[in-house]
Amino acid sequence: MDNKIHQWKTGNGINAVSRFWTCKCLFGVKEKCSVRVNYIMFDVTDHCNFRCKHCYKNQPDDYTDINVDNIILFLNEFKSRGQRPSIVISGGEPLLYKDLYKLLDYVCDGRSVRVNTNGLLLQKKLDKLLNYKNLSLQVSLDGYDDETFFEIRNNHYFDRIVENTRTAFQAGLNVYFRATLTNKTISHYEKFIALSDKTEVPLVIRPMYNTGEVEQQKLKIGFEELCEWQQNILKRGQIKYTGGKDLISESSCPLLHKDLIYSTLTVDNRGNVYPCQLLRSRQFYMGNISSDTYDMIFSHGEEM
């Protein structure tokens, strides 16, 4: 694998849950605590050009885009408090978001910014994306060939996306593949590594999160098989590994400090705010950036 490092991230949602609940349950949050958000994910649209089996979106025919001015006002509240959280822009397909470049103009100010994309439009958008510093792109590639890609993505764009990503990487864009392993592909994970080595595009690979959707239940990995896989990759050399233990350690999860409530936030395409990507049900609703102030949103969170 030469000197290139493949990064492995594992876990079954425990990191996302722990970020919110450790403080709520272990320490209790009865007294006034400080708020320090390190990372915000904005699902800017539910418009998408794919229909993936494992996606937690409802895949509507009609779509809604978040108001970019509301995002900017919301982030200005953090700025006025001396905070500049890292930003992830997701969807849907964020490259279809009509105000993507206006948002990037604002957030690409030296902080870490990532766009999660399926890569289909990457070559078309490449020239503009190259203008932004501190921007990275994560290209979802959940199959290692056209057949396994179709099993998840329901289309035959595999070769096109691989080529788009390789072209973007060679042009100087900070881009990498993100592979989500399922029970169909976990035994062939080395083929993802081979694809990464062939294209020279970096790779992040992790098991599929289980959010309870029926199609995800069909694809989820059994616990024993997941443990065996983790042991196998630990035996490999030149691999940076982030396992479940690391994910919930105090050093990597700031939420574990009792005077801090939040480490992450997720804002959906309608402006609704939740503690993280996996906690989107009604009981975790914190407020809406279009109608609630910063203080109202975090006071709602304390009442959950």
Language-model features: locations:
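Radical SAM enzyme [4Fe-4S]-AdoMet core and its adjacent flexible, acidic
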Residues: S140-D142, E147-Y285, I289
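Hydrophobic faces of well-ordered beta-strands that scaffold small-molecule active sites
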Residues: I40, P85-I87, V113-V115, L137-V139, ...
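Immediate flanking context of iron-sulfur cluster ligation sites
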Residues: F298-M304
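Residue-level detector of structured alpha->beta connecting loops
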Residues: Q83, K133-N134, G172, E200
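Conserved alpha-helical substructure of the radical SAM core
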Residues: D2-K133
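A broadly conserved sequence feature marking short terminus-proximal activation segments
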Residues: D2-K24, N269-D295
